[in-house]
């Protein structure tokens, strides 16, 4: 559904960048958190902590991490665009630069027929 959000050029692009900054940016953050927890072997403890606050959070995080793998190669460029959008607004842009790197590391899953195992995704991030 097309919506008009104003007469000014660039408003729709800015909205798209802000929306993806959250939706795809938080998925990259969750993926990085899971990989970081995997490295010292505290992922199960993290799950217990998350699930004590929100009983389905760890399952949602796992699902979000694995379901983006086939499209992650596209998200790298989008995160770089978002980073530029933040910079143009006078805001720090490092988070989305890091998100671009997370998606870059997942690019090997492009066109994979089946959703990969979480452990395989985390291994690709930790390389």
What do these predicted regions represent?
Residues 1-9:
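A short, charged helix-loop
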Residues 15-115:
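Helical "substrate-binding/catalytic lid" subdomain
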Residues 8, 31-33, 124:
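Short, surface-exposed, polar/charged, turn-prone segments marking secondary-structure boundaries
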Residues 9-10, 21:
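Glycine-rich "substrate-gating" loop/helix at the edge of Rossmann-like oxidoreductase active sites
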Residues 114-127:
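Short, basic/aromatic-enriched C-terminal tail that caps enzymatic domains
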């Amino acid at each position: 559904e097309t919506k008009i959000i104003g007469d000014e050029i660039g408003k729709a692009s800015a909205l798209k960048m802000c929306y993806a900054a959250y939706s795809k940016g938080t998925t990259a953050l969750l993926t990085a958190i899971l990989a970081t927890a995997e490295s010292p072997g505290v992922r199960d403890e993290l799950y217990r902590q998350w699930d004590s606050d929100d009983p389905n959070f760890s399952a949602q995080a796992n699902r979000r991490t694995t379901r983006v793998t086939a499209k992650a190669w596209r998200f790298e460029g989008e995160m770089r665009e978002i980073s530029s959008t933040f910079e143009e607004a006078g805001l720090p842009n490092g988070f989305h630069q890091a998100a671009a790197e997370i998606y870059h590391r997942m690019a090997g899953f492009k066109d994979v027929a089946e959703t990969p195992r979480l452990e395989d995704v985390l291994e690709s991030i930790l390389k």
